[in-house]
Amino acid sequence: MRLFSLLLVSLLYLANLPALAAGDVSHSTPSVAERLTDARKYIDTKNWSRAAFELDKAVREEPKNADVYNMLGFYNRKKPNADLPKAFENYNMALKLDPKHRAAHEYLGEAYLMDKKPAEAEKLLANLEVLCGNKNCEEYKDLAEAIAKYKAGQ
């Protein structure tokens, strides 16, 4: 009986060797979508260096991903000493990669408001109405609200 138990334990151990050799799979590399989610959290908490790290990794991993460039634009617009020229470049790249990217239209419009160009923001609002098919999508509502606040502050 003792020999049988020893054999059983040995067989179970040997059966798990490939899994042990593969290492701990719980430490896998984050996907670009996960990096963008993390970057947004870091931006929201003003952890600019971590946001920049995640975005740098994301753009290296998927250089043709419109969501990556949209988030880069958001980062460059929101960080201290906003870099609007870089934000415009990022948003325009997102729209080049995906002309129907609604968030890029919204955020580019908000960047134009920061640059005191409300007419450009209103053009993007009109684009959003077409892309959304109505005035009820979140991106349209957010940009419309930002334009209204901008005009009220004038």
Tell where the protein language model's regions lie, with residue ranges.
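Canonical positions in the second alpha-helix
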Residues: 58, 93-94, 127-128
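Helix-start (N-cap) detector for alpha-helical repeat units in TPR-like alpha-solenoids
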Residues: 32, 66-67, 102-103, 136
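Canonical tetratricopeptide repeat
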Residues: 71-72, 107, 143-146
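Terminal, low-structured helical/coil segments at or just beyond the last alpha-helical repeat
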Residues: 7, 20-33, 122-154
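Alpha-helical segment of the N-proximal tetratricopeptide repeat
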Residues: 30-60
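Structural signature of tandem alpha-helical TPR/SEL1-like repeats
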Residues: 45-53, 80-93, 116-124
